[in-house]
């Protein structure tokens, strides 16, 4: 029923975000990002309203600082998508075991929409990081425009590494 879904949404908002007090301009960006996140066939489809993902195949966004602290890495993932074995929040995710590729949103979202949804993720789900600005998205979009296809985890880690990523390839 509509009332119970509104109550669930309100409970989720209270529990997961925003994680800091935002000024009026940043709150507007946050709300735009929340709306982009919730669009059909966008982030919410796999990562869920609460950011917990779909275990055991879709990694969580909750308390996920290792993947989202680097602005450029996060923007590249959202623009081009990501495929390959990885560790997120202490768990191993592997395409050989059913983990789908992260969708590439570069052709679907404008710079301001992408910046807003990344800001929403960085300021929700227990994450408390600075916003991503549209000019940063534009810069990374231009730098990666000739790249075709998903980023593999190996390629992304060579450009924007997370310490210890090499061990992910050997985990079972």
Spans of features found by a protein language model:
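Flexible coil segments in periplasmic/lumen-exposed cytochrome c-class electron-transfer proteins
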Residues: 1-28, 89-93, 97-100, 104-172
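Structured segments of extracytoplasmic/periplasmic soluble domains
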Residues: 36-40, 49, 64, 77-81, ...
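Short, flexible micro-motifs
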Residues: 36, 54-56, 84, 93, ...
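Sequence/structural segment immediately N-terminal to covalent heme-attachment motifs in c-type
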Residues: 12, 26-54, 66-80
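Short acidic alpha-helical/loop segments enriched in Asp/Glu that coordinate divalent cations
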Residues: 49, 54-60, 88-91
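Electron-transfer interface patches adjacent to heme c in soluble/periplasmic c-type cytochromes
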Residues: 41, 60-88, 97-115
